[in-house]
Amino acid sequence: MSLRNWFSQLDKEHQSSIDYKKYKPIWADIRTSNYCNLQCNMCSQADSSQIQSFVKKNTHMSKYFRQVAAGNNLDINIDIDFSNLKFLKLAGGEPTIDPYCIAFLDKFIKKYDASKVELIITTNATRIKNFFDKYKSKFKSLTVILSIDAVDEVYNLIRFPANWNTVKHNVDQLCTMKEININLNFVIQPYNILVADQWLHFISKFVKDRPKTKIDFLNCINPKHFSIDAMPDSAKQFVTDMLKTSEKNFPNIRKKISELQTIVTNSSYKQDYHAILVDHLHDISKIRNIDYIKTIPEFKYLL
């Protein structure tokens, strides 16, 4: 369970005994709903309404997603005084298109002085223009955390039904807004680590253009079949060799590449995780009518 989920559950259990009007937070981490336009393989029904819909139509696929309670993490109506707020963090779902999130922001701006608040938003960057055109001038500063995970065909697989070319165009447009801080998130899993050299090239160029960019590599541990533990030793050896080459090719992000090497080194092969991973690859290929093993040659190391 994520920290945000844990606090939401705690709220539900103790809501009646807490007088929220006494508190004036300076930091708020808000997730209004699971409304989302993607069905990323490492997410859950609680994270994405698209996954909810997908699982309803393909019930046999539910076993591959992270097993948490379906629905919204936050379904409470609390009267909180945000007058002292300095940092507002928004996540989803996809907050840039979530009508609940937009309604919350509109209400917040109307009631409080948003020019004193730093807005931090995590987004998949699929539909961001209207959101940032509307809100970027309202807040003291804006930090955008881009959930990327990969590029090209592997991006399209992991973050289905998003298209990398469209997202890359949106990110390029976002980068022209120098007043916006941009950070990158990558959830490390077998599908993307096998082509790490491709997205490390993207990161290397990105950091050259925006040196203050923060890069976060989040090691996927749930679902377990999307952890690096699901990779056979031959696949990990391929990745290890590739990362050594990447260190030479992208010296400006050598420390970040070292983090990936540590993730691979610290993993321990689990045959049962591997079997489920391969089953997922075959099942998702069949459902989408895309032979990912042929489309992405590096996936042969997973078989």
Language-model-detected regions and their locations in the chain:
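Core AdoMet radical
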Residues: 23-35, 46-72, 83-99, 111-130, ...
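Distinct, well-ordered alpha-helical segments
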Residues: 102-106, 129-136, 195-199
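Short amphipathic alpha-helical surface micro-motifs
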Residues: 8-13, 70-72, 104, 127-129
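Non-transmembrane alpha-helical segments in soluble domains
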Residues: 40, 102-109, 172, 200-204
